[in-house]
Swiss-Prot record:
GO MF: ATP binding; DNA binding; DNA topoisomerase type II (double strand cut, ATP-hydrolyzing) activity
Top EC class, one word: isomerase
Assembly notes: Homodimer. Heterotetramer of two Top6A and two Top6B chains.
GO BP term (any one): DNA topological change
Annotated TM spans: none
Protein name per UniProt: Type 2 DNA topoisomerase 6 subunit B
Gene source species: Thermococcus sibiricus (strain DSM 12597 / MM 739)
The enzyme's E.C. designation: 5.6.2.2
Chain residues that bind ATP: 48, 80, 101-102, 111-118, 475
Catalytic activity: ATP-dependent breakage, passage and rejoining of double-stranded DNA
Length: 566
């Protein structure tokens, strides 16, 4: 009876693919709401284009076109001059989730999960029923035209039709065409136009063209010919890993011993550190064997203070025996490392001291390029920026914060906070983002901005990391990590001080202009009076007074400008 009931219960048991999961939960990828869904779709395609161009060393040219086909029904076209996609990878790139060139690597990139563009293809498929048309070539081969969809049950790309065309001109790049329904184009601060505008600011080396549904062409011209240096893959840091990381990496490594595996595949681990690790694991094993709670607490205190050799010595022969056992772990093949041993390694790492992880692999926008981007797109009267030194969060994940500030000029009244992660604009979920809280918690009145919400002020904040701590798979909000919050706050205060100095100089200049006009107003009257008293010609006296005023205010102007430039 029990068996038959169990059979009935498990009759509907089904293994769900990752594609099927995200088909049912598209909101987790950012496809929620008509406006946001369209922006997310464009974001995924443009991000792919920029990353591909930069990795291939090509200055990006990206063209986006939205054609209205009906009510809440659009055709989306995104074309780039990137390296193109080899024929055998087309189905995987556009039709298989959790597949890509970057998701498995510890490297800074705009996309992190290997879901992006395949998620867009799936969204087009489930809203319009149409496959996505891909036209691509690597330049040296034929042009491939393929209609791609996703088999959601298998999480596999499916090519419905494929045509090969001759390529006499050597065209190279990728063009994506997809039909989507249940979306809406609106020119708002969460729409496609604003997204592309913000993308152009943070990527001044990119040329971006946009054709709106009404046919209007908008061009965000390239303002820098300097291609960003490609980011470097970085080894994981001992303070930023979990047991599963070590265990899985140990199963895949080609290294012959646990010692060489740890030294070769993690940063800041040397032979000396391995010897230290052996001592910490030994000390932890011995402490766990101790039955008396008071003694155990005293030993843990000594462990925290780094007195591992004294702890081992206090156990006499038992300590030496455990030390020999742990040393053997370091010399065995990594594939034979047990889960418990991996746990011991991670636990020991927590008590050890390591140099901060190397940060050479991070690639910020850079102060000069931030200022070029803000100036070229926003045309302010004042612009400044700061790139903070690299730091780490969660003990071992490197990150860097940079902030740009633009004020006045063609900026309209109203504070604009431009949030970015690895150069990618974050348009949604601002309330839960650490960038918002850090920027808003500044007392702007201290920096001569009396009402920040009405000031013609734009603040760009970019968080750079090999692993940005997003709050969700939609990747629109950065989690509130204490170290990141503090770095943003310090960077914002830095540029705010520069703004205050500029505004102070501007106010003094206006005051001096007012004083000069007042003095000049009295020149004719004073000239007449002095002429009567001295007998000198009135015109000559007037000329002398004007010269005195000019010299006086010329020196004041120079002093104010020098202070503003400092």
């Amino acid at each position: 009876m029990a068996n038959s009931e169990a059979d009935k219960l498990f009759k509907e048991f089904k293994i769900q693919s990752v594609s099927e999961f995200f088909r049912r939960n598209a909101a987790m990828l950012g496809y929620t709401g008509k406006l946001r869904s369209l922006t997310t779709l464009i974001h995924e395609a443009v991000t792919n284009s920029l990353d591909a161009c930069e990795e291939a060393g090509i200055l990006p040219y990206v063209r986006v076109e939205i054609e209205e086909l009906g009510t809440e029904h659009y055709k989306i076209i995104v074309e780039d001059n990137g390296p193109g996609i080899p024929e055998k990878f087309i189905a995987h790139v556009f039709g298989k989730m959790l597949a890509g060139t970057k998701a498995h690597r510890n490297i800074q990139s705009r996309g992190q999960q290997g879901i992006g563009i395949s998620g867009a293809v799936m969204f087009a498929q489930i809203t319009s029923g149409k496959a996505t048309r891909i036209i691509t070539s690597t330049g040296e081969e034929e042009i491939i035209e393929a209609w791609v969809g996703i088999d959601v049950d298998k999480n596999e790309g499916k090519i419905f039709k494929k045509i090969k065309h001759p390529n006499p001109t050597g065209w190279r790049g990728t063009r994506i065409e997809m039909e989507v329904k249940d979306v809406r184009y609106i020119r708002s601060k969460q729409g496609v136009y604003w997204y592309l505008k913000l993308t152009a600011i943070a990527n001044p080396h990119a040329h971006i063209e946009f054709i709106e549904p009404d046919g209007k062409l908008i061009v965000f011209s390239r303002s820098s010919e300097e291609l960003p240096e490609p980011p470097e893959e970085m080894k994981p840091h001992p303070k930023g890993i979990i047991t599963d990381d070590i265990y899985r990496m140990a199963q895949r490594t080609t290294r012959t011993t646990v010692r060489t595996f740890l030294i070769g595949e993690f940063s800041r681990i040397s032979d000396k550190k391995i010897d230290e690790l052996v001592q910490y694991i030994t000390a932890l094993r011995l402490i766990k064997e101790e039955e008396e709670q008071n003694v155990k607490e005293q030993l843990m205190k000594r462990l925290v203070d780094g007195e591992v050799d004294k702890i081992i010595a206090s156990f006499g022969k038992r300590g030496k025996k455990v030390l020999r056992e742990v040393r053997k772990i370091m010399e065995k093949p990594p594939k034979k490392l047990t889960w418990h041993e991996a746990e011991e390694i991670v636990e020991a790492f927590k008590y050890m001291t390591f140099l901060a992880p190397p940060t050479h692999g991070l690639r910020p926008i850079g102060e000069e390029n931030i200022e070029k981007g803000l100036t070229g797109i926003l045309r302010p009267e004042f612009v400044t920026s700061v790139t903070r030194p690299p730091k780490v969060y969660r003990g071992g994940i490197p990150f860097q914060v940079e902030v740009g500030l633009a004020f006045g000029g063609e900026l309209s009244s109203g504070f604009d906070l431009l949030r970015y992660a690895n150069r990618v604009p974050l348009l949604f979920d601002a309330g839960s983002c650490v960038i918002t809280s850090a920027a808003r918690n500044i007392d702007w009145k201290r920096y001569r901005v009396d009402d920040v919400d009405r000031a013609p002020l734009a603040l760009l904040v970019n968080v750079v990391s090999v692993h940005v701590p997003y709050t969700s798979t939609g990747k629109q909000s950065v989690a509130n990590e204490e170290e990141i919050y503090e770095e943003i706050r310090l960077a914002v205060m830095d540029v705010a001080r520069r703004l205050a100095k500029y505004l102070g100089g501007k106010h003094r200049k206006l005051y001096q202009v007012k004083r000069r006009k007042t003095l000049e107003k009295y020149v004719p009257e004073v000239s007449r009076a002095l002429s009567i008293l001295t007998g000198l010609p009135e015109g000559e006296i007037k000329k002398m007074l004007v010269t005195i005023i000019e010299k006086k205010f010329e020196s004041i102007d120079e002093a104010v400008e020098a202070e503003s430039d400092a």
